[in-house]
Curated annotation (Swiss-Prot):
Domain of life: Eukaryota
Topology of the protein relative to the lipid bilayer: Peripheral membrane protein
KW Repeat (keyword) present: yes
Ranges for the LRR repeats: 141-166, 167-190, 191-213, 214-237, 238-263, 265-286, 287-311, 312-336, 337-360, 362-387
Descriptive protein name: Piriformospora indica-insensitive protein 2
Length: 424
């Protein structure tokens, strides 16, 4: 009993004074010890209420938004022993996110969140409205690193020139909204950008030729707009770029030689534009490419043999359909051992199909050569047809045929390519 009392006393002393004789235990930091800045909390409530509706009572529902009553879409961090909002996402991004009201307001209190690093709006702006006053956005210039507007058809008008004042931005995503007009050249002031997306809007006019300083940019997506004119030569200075998507615009002219300087590029998608003048010889120098999509551009009577496709050994997707290409299918294509998709359809290709060499490509899972002037006999094996299924098309080649036994065989005729006549 005496020993039990002795050890209990030792335990009590260790709790009171610590192992090293300290007179107090370490402090625990929580929302009680680090309260939220009062003005910050009120600004947050008012800003969210403007988007959600006046019936939303933030102080009653979420009395401690950075602590024990967190708001979905709100993240906080501590500055000078006080909690401040650092991330704010509005709209039904997640199942339990706060939905935006059809009569929302962008209140000035939003721009009082001075430590905000990330701000995103998803499916919030449905009714037509112009983005908030230009001068308010400069309040975010010191800290904002990510700004996203996704699926907001009611966001109309031009992108404000003051967007270029947000020089800390690393990610600017303006995806599937109602913006129109020309891109402000001030976006090229955003030297820290790694991702720049303006896809799915109604932007028009020429792309500003001012990208020289964006050395850190990894992703540039301007697809699904109405941009016109030629490609800026300053694209060649985007030395870190991994993905360039300019598809579905009204761009025209020759492909600039400067594209060949993009040595880290993995995706180049220029489909559905008006480019002409043939394939740029420098494209074959982008040996990092895994996806090259140039389909539906009137490139003219370009001979495919003039390009050494074998140099682009990392290609997985190659789509050159509807380009007016002529000549034979180059044998250098058969060196692309990683190729899974090859689209050569609806061109003016002639000559024989290198069946055995194409079949030898180990990863090939889709081959489209329909709509050309190819001749001779298809010499693919039944195993190839079984593998490809309907992902192989060779129809609309008037002088192309398939072996008679392929058509006559009851066990194989279901594999024979549609629209290819039997050889006689």
């Amino acid at each position: 009993m005496l020993w039990q009392t002795f050890f209990s006393s030792l335990l009590l002393l260790s709790l009171l004074f610590g192992c090293n004789g300290d007179e107090s235990l370490p402090e625990v930091t929580d929302s009680e010890e680090a309260p939220m800045d009062k003005r910050e909390r009120e600004a947050l409530y008012s800003a969210i209420q403007g988007f959600v509706g006046d019936s939303w009572n933030g102080s009653a529902l979420y009395p401690d938004p950075c602590g024990w009553t967190p708001i979905q879409g709100v993240s906080c961090d501590i500055y000078n022993d006080l909690w401040y909002v650092t991330d704010l996402s509005l709209g039904l991004i997640y199942e339990n996110s706060l939905p935006c009201s059809s009569s929302l307001q962008i209140r000035p209190e939003l721009f009082e969140l001075k430590h905000l690093r990330s701000l995103s709006f998803f499916n919030c702006f449905i009714s037509p409205m112009v983005i908030a006053k230009e001068e308010l956005w400069t309040n975010f210039a010191s800290n904002l690193e990510s700004l996203e507007f996704r699926s907001n058809p009611g966001l109309i008008g031009e992108l404000p020139e003051t967007i270029g004042n947000l020089t800390k931005l690393k990610s600017l995503v303006v995806l599937e909204n109602g913006f129109s007009g020309e891109l402000p050249a001030s976006i090229c002031n955003l030297k820290r950008l790694k991702r720049l997306v303006f896809a799915g809007n109604s932007f028009a006019g020429m792309i500003p030729n001012c990208f020289k300083g964006l050395k850190e940019l990894l992703i540039l997506d301007l697809s699904r707009n109405s941009f016109s004119g030629t490609l800026p030569t300053s694209f060649g200075d985007l030395v870190s770029l991994l993905k360039l998507d300019l598809s579905n615009n009204l761009l025209e002219g020759n492909l600039p030689q400067e594209l060949g300087f993009l040595k880290n590029l993995t995706l180049l998608d220029l489909r559905n534009n008006r480019f002409s003048g043939g394939l740029s010889k420098n494209i074959e120098n982008i040996q990092s490419l895994t996806e090259l999509v140039l389909s539906n551009n009137p490139m003219g009577e370009e001979d495919m043999v003039g390009t050494n496709w074998g140099k682009m050994s990392n290609l997985v997707v190659l789509d050159l359909s509807k380009m007016g290409l002529r000549g034979e299918i180059p044998t250098s294509l058969t060196n692309l051992k990683r190729l899974r998709f090859l689209g050569l359809n609806n061109n003016n290709l002639t000559g024989f199909v290198p069946s055995k060499k194409l079949e030898a490509l180990p990863c090939l899972g889709a081959l489209y050569i329909n709509g050309n002037n190819l001749t001779g006999e298809l010499r693919f094996s039944t195993k190839f047809y079984e593998k490809m299924g309907r992902r192989f098309k060779a129809s609309k080649n008037p002088n192309l045929c398939q072996p008679l036994e392929m058509v006559m065989s009851e066990s194989h005729k279901h594999l024979s390519p549609l629209g290819v006549k039997p050889c006689t």
